[in-house]
Amino acid sequence: MILWSPSTCSFFWHWCLIAVSVLSSRSKESLRLSWSSDESSASSSSRICPLSNSKSVRLPQYPRGFGDVSGYRVSSSVSECYVQHGVLVAAWLVRGNFSDTAPRAYGTWGNERSATHFKVGAPQLENDGALRYETELPQVDARLSYVMLTVYPCSACNRSVLHCRPASRLPWLPLRVTPSDLERLFAERRYLTFLYVVLVQFVKHVALFSFGVQVACCVYLRWIRPWVRGRHRATGRTSREEEAKDD
């Protein structure tokens, strides 16, 4: 019969722990190797796939450099713009060297808070070679503070911005005025002109009212009153004749 002493048991237990640790380390190493092999295979497959399909992908060509465009530019310009009855009318006369007879251009109007772009029609060629741009925009904001034209002398040139500050345009006797005109004058701080326009409108409406009253009185006295009197006389005559017959 074998007797297990305490020293023998501790020795046996020590060697069991060593064996278990060795086996666990080998299993971890094999698992790490298998995981690394899977990752390497996945990365190699992901690298190989695009190369196999690279023949079907067409890369864009590198853009060629533009030539010398320093000669294309806007040399001078004259602008005129105004607002009347809520309609913005603007015109620009542009001179310079352009690569095309109708260079690309667009317009912008707005104020300090917002801006709105609009299309500009084809320019008109003047006798001296200048280009004339004209535009007419209805129902614009009465508080607009600027309108500008952006012109590109060539396709690769920097833009040239031509500014213009519109002002309200009214005749010396403003008989026809819209609320937009009054709002525009108030926004421009032309208070004296604003009061003058209001006074003219007040006098105009008073004159129209008095004229209407006079026309109504004339019509009544000329046609309506004689017709009413004649009708009363006719009815009175017929009533008297009927009374005489009854008697």
UniProtKB/Swiss-Prot annotation:
Keywords for the protein's UniProt record, in alphabetical order: Disulfide bond, Glycoprotein, Host cytoplasm, Host cytoskeleton, Host endoplasmic reticulum, Host Golgi apparatus, Host membrane, Immunoglobulin domain, Membrane, Signal, Transmembrane, Transmembrane helix
Family matches, as InterPro entries: CMV_US (IPR012536)
Transmembrane segments: 193-213
S-S bonds: 81-164
Glycosylation sites recorded in the entry for this protein: 97, 158
Topological category with respect to the lipid bilayer: Single-pass type I membrane protein
Subcellular location: Host endoplasmic reticulum membrane; Host cytoplasm, Host cytoskeleton; Host Golgi apparatus membrane
Residue numbers on the Cytoplasmic membrane side: 214-247
Cellular component terms (Gene Ontology): host cell endoplasmic reticulum membrane; host cell Golgi membrane; host cytoskeleton; membrane
Superkingdom of origin: Viruses
Name this polypeptide is given: Membrane glycoprotein US9
Gene source species: Human cytomegalovirus (strain Merlin) (HHV-5)
Top-level taxonomy: Viruses, Duplodnaviria, Heunggongvirae, Peploviricota, Herviviricetes
